[in-house]
Amino acid sequence: MSNTNNIQEEWTEMVEEMNNAVADSMEQNMKAQAAFVESWADAVEDTIPEQDDLADGMDGYNRAYEEWMDAAEQMVERSTDAAQGEDVDPAEFRDIWLQSANEAFKHVMGTSAFAAANGQLVESMMEMQQEADDLSQDTLEQLGFPTRNDVDEIAERLIELERRQHAVEQKLDRVLEHLEE
């Protein structure tokens, strides 16, 4: 019977260890998920426009929409005129849409929301460009080619050597002048 108790105790101990391992794993998983959600929220928060920018953007979008609706009305009017026999130049239709497009783009592109979005885009592109540049410099270094920093350092040394050479030449000229006297 003591053997049965021993097996039962070992079983209980093993199940308890497994439960603890699962609990620890779940706790680590929850921490990782919380960190991910927090990171994601921070990233999303940076992309959400300010309330004023959002309102300005919506206002610009609404004005652009009105431009397109006005253009559609003009197109219907001119189409009706053409259907009633009036001689309508097809270039008028093109001009209506081009004018409307220009005005609509002005309304949208003139908003602070567009400026903010464009600023974020430029910032992201510059970061990507810097990352690509860093990667190319690392690749050059790993392949044994000189990097931009290596070339800059050599250029600085060369300039310093030229400066020193010029100073030595001036001293030599003074010595030669003194010997000639």
UniProtKB/Swiss-Prot annotation:
Keyword RNA-binding: no
Keywords noted in UniProt: Acyltransferase, PHA biosynthesis, PHB biosynthesis, Transferase
This protein's pathway: Biopolymer metabolism; poly-(R)-3-hydroxybutanoate biosynthesis
Protein name stated in the entry: Poly(3-hydroxyalkanoate) polymerase subunit PhaE
Practical application: PHB and PHBV are desirable bioplastic due to their biodegradability, biocompatibility, and mechanical properties. However, PHBV has better mechanical properties than PHB.
Its EC number(s): 2.3.1.-
Family as reported in the entry's similarity comment: Belongs to the PHA/PHB synthase family.
Lineage start: Archaea, Methanobacteriati, Methanobacteriota, Stenosarchaea group, Halobacteria
Subunit relationships: Heterodimer with PhaC.
Record keyword Magnesium present: no
GO biological process, any: poly-hydroxybutyrate biosynthetic process
Top-tier EC class: transferase
The protein's role, per its UniProt record: Involved in the production of polyhydroxyalkonic acids (PHAs), which are water-insoluble biopolymers used as intracellular energy reserve material when cells grow under conditions of nutrient limitation. PHAs are composed primarily of 3-hydroxybutyric acid (3HB) and 3-hydroxyvaleric acid (3HV). Required for the production of poly-beta-hydroxybutyrate (PHB) and poly(beta-hydroxybutyrate-co-beta-hydroxyvalerate) (PHBV).
Any GO MF annotation of the entry: acyltransferase activity
Matches recorded under Pfam families: PHA_synth_III_E
